[in-house]
């Protein structure tokens, strides 16, 4: 019984701190790894256009608009064209990035919360601890034992809820 109390607290602490501090970094890191090993044409094209854009911008900044106007105008047109093309391509990449991050976030949510739900389902009949019958009215004892625990005990579901609220209130 004591191991159920402690494991529930530790699991809730892990989930809370993972969501608060590590989830965004994990998702961003996974996306960066995917981009570096991916053969996605849109990602490669976006990177190539960005490299060309930066090269043209560097040349444009090095060229005087008064002394070498023809060269500067040609580079400026090329820069504007690449800039528009990069913006269009970036919109496609942004949609893909948002979808990738949303799917990975859902996977992590299922992984962390799913484990908690599994434990709650598996141990739903196991009481976490018992309360004295004179301490609370009978309806309160019944509510604390929901969904399937023994009357007069605190169920794992109620205990999990209390632990989560306490942790989120403290941290």
From Swiss-Prot:
Residues 38-95 form a coiled coil. Pfam families: CHD5. Keywords: Coiled coil, Endoplasmic reticulum, Membrane, Phosphoprotein, Transmembrane, Transmembrane helix, Transport. It is a multi-pass membrane protein. The keyword Nucleus does not apply. The keyword Phosphoprotein applies. Residues 1-4, 130-153 are lumenal. GO terms for biological process: tail-anchored membrane protein insertion into ER membrane. It is found in: Endoplasmic reticulum membrane. The modification Phosphoserine is found at residue 65. InterPro entries: Get1, Get1_fungi, Helix_hairpin_bin_sf. GO terms for molecular function: membrane insertase activity; protein-membrane adaptor activity. Residues 25-108, 171 are cytoplasmic. One of its GO terms (cellular component) is endoplasmic reticulum. Its main location: endoplasmic reticulum. The chain crosses the membrane at residues 5-24, 109-129, 154-170. Interacts with get3. Belongs to the WRB/GET1 family. Required for the post-translational delivery of tail-anchored (TA) proteins to the endoplasmic reticulum. Acts as a membrane receptor for soluble get3, which recognizes and selectively binds the transmembrane domain of TA proteins in the cytosol. This is Protein get1.
């Amino acid at each position: 019984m004591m191991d159920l109390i402690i494991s529930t607290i530790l699991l809730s602490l892990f989930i809370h701190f993972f969501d608060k501090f590590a989830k965004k970094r994990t998702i961003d890191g996974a996306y960066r790894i995917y981009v570096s090993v991916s053969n996605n044409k849109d990602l490669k094209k976006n990177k190539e256009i960005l490299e060309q854009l930066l090269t043209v911008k560097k040349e444009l900044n090095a060229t005087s608009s008064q002394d070498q106007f023809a060269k500067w105008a040609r580079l400026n047109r090329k820069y504007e064209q690449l800039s528009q093309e990069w913006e269009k391509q970036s919109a496609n990449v942004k949609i893909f990035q948002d979808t990738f991050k949303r799917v990975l976030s859902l996977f992590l949510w299922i992984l962390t919360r799913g484990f908690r739900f599994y434990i709650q389902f598996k141990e739903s009949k196991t009481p976490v601890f018992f309360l004295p019958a004179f301490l609370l009215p009978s309806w309160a004892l019944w509510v604390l034992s929901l969904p399937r625990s023994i009357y007069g005990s605190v169920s794992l579901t109620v205990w999990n809820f209390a632990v989560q609220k306490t942790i989120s209130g403290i941290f």
